[in-house]
């Protein structure tokens, strides 16, 4: 599913910065940049009908911590806007094409008190 998301993001002029970024405090499936925006993306796949579930509160917190770690380690400019997105990919049946839904601003992380966060 992440490979499909990477291809779709590239067509939309996003530049992939990291894939499966892991650190002790969490993980982010994809990190991409488009202009002055840094986007942290959770990718969900579902092989049957219905929406792929959005990440729960604990998983969102781990993604936010991993985003902060990424920004710190990569010395990301504090002038970049951060955004947390969800990409849902589904393949309802063998005969149907896969479906991709990109949900920008899937959750708000403005409560994060970190010098890197910019709402």
Predicted regions: what they are:
Residues 1-20:
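Acidic-basic catalytic patches of nuclease active cores, encompassing PD-(D/E)XK
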Residues 12-13, 24-28, 80-82:
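Short beta-strand or tight-loop elements
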Residues 16-18, 40, 84, 100:
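Hydrophobic residues on conserved beta-strands that form the core of alpha/beta folds
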Residues 21, 43-45, 105:
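Active-site donor-binding loop signature of nucleotide-sugar glycosyltransferases
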Residues 22-24, 35, 94:
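Short strand-coil-strand connectors
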Residues 28-50, 63:
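Conserved catalytic cores of phosphodiester-cleaving nucleases, focusing on short active-site segments
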Residues 46-69, 73:
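Mg2+/Mn2+-dependent nuclease catalytic core
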Residues 75-119:
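Domain-level recognition of nuclease-like catalytic cores that cleave nucleotide substrates
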